[in-house]
Amino acid sequence: MTDADLIKHLWTHKTQDHPSWSDEDLMIERGEGVYIWNRKGRRLFDAYAGLAVVNVGHGRTEIADAVREQVAKLAYYPTTRQFSNPPAAQLAARLAELTPGDLKYTLFAVSGSEANERSMQIARMYWLKLGRPRKYKVISLTHGYNGATIGTLAICGQPDMVRAYEPFAWQGFRKVAVPYSLWERGAGTDEDLVRRCADGLTDAIREEEAETVAAVILEPCLSAGGCIIPPLGWLERVRDICDELDVLMIADEVITGFGRTGKWFGVEHEQVVPDLMSVAKGITSGYIPLSASIARAKLADAFPENSLEENVHPNTYCGHPVACAAALANLAIIERENLVKNAQTMGARLHAAIEARVCDYPIVGEVRSRGLMLALDFADPGQPGQPLDSRLVASLNTRALNKGYIAVAKDSVLRLARPLCITASEVDELAHLVGETVHELQDEVTRSARSRAAVA
């Protein structure tokens, strides 16, 4: 069978069309470092690290060796019914060392969506264990994205992603404004913006009645929402509000965790310790699916003998020994090669290099970044204060492919999330490619505006 015949049976998430690229062209066969190759041998710069997941880069033989060794020794046994396995126990201990504060107890799962589901379940069960069953509601952020299950879609702050699934069977979810968006910013300083949104969160909890709110869940930086980077001070205010009103704080670190923002975890930019932390993606760099919910001691203490068997249900693959072995090898690479620091250094270099190339283009409203999360937000030159037509921005997906790199363009934003192992020369290469792509788009917008003016 040809590749085309095989692909007919694969139900992919086709969110963009690439007119000049066939499905066979987009079948990726191998990867090394920041690059991937399709079946025809075409090299592409993976400027989105798969889905912001391949933190250590492609082709790491150390992880493959760890997986091979573990499969030969013990390919599978779950962490349920008091059973465990060495890789799961070792990884839980390692996470207790890496995570801030007293986040010391880990419940493993498979995907980021599931980790957030688990975190919400633990939050609800915690209050139930304390004899406060009315505390079941969860507050999330507009523009936020916390997963693709029905439960996590219920807290999703992006209406176009959830409309088809409404109404939700689960009740008790509310969204509040996130303190950053180029198009919704309004007047005032960053401090004013944080204050307004913090007041909005406080008001929402009080309107719902604090005795009915279990948790607030938020991403330190909102990736799928457009790489929104709230001003410093926001996480600290959320922590204070949660403490004041007796509500748990859940940090969704599925994307921001394990070095992506230039710190091991996104909350560390403000020295904040959440009550629960959801992690995935960078825990194994995507080599094998794995996720986790990590809880503070006070939550674990509420469960008999720190056991979650009752009501917080395990799944078949929790604590999978092969996935945990991959994670241990992955974390060793991140630490040994100082990739967290590299994310900070190379992220700053890329931001400066891209900004220097595009800052004079009228269509560029803003370049923003934290570590190796970066976004270009595009503005409509003909309508001040308005984003560029999303169809034009979406064309950047194919424009980037034609230039030889992969990025994600949606709504008004082009997002980049490179592997943490990126080098200075690779940063410069990517900045050049992005600059050329934006130049092409600017030319098209300028020509279109001139054509309309000539007709008028």
What are these regions (language model features)?
Residues 1-456:
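Conserved N-terminal phosphate-binding loop of PLP-dependent enzymes in the Aspartate aminotransferase
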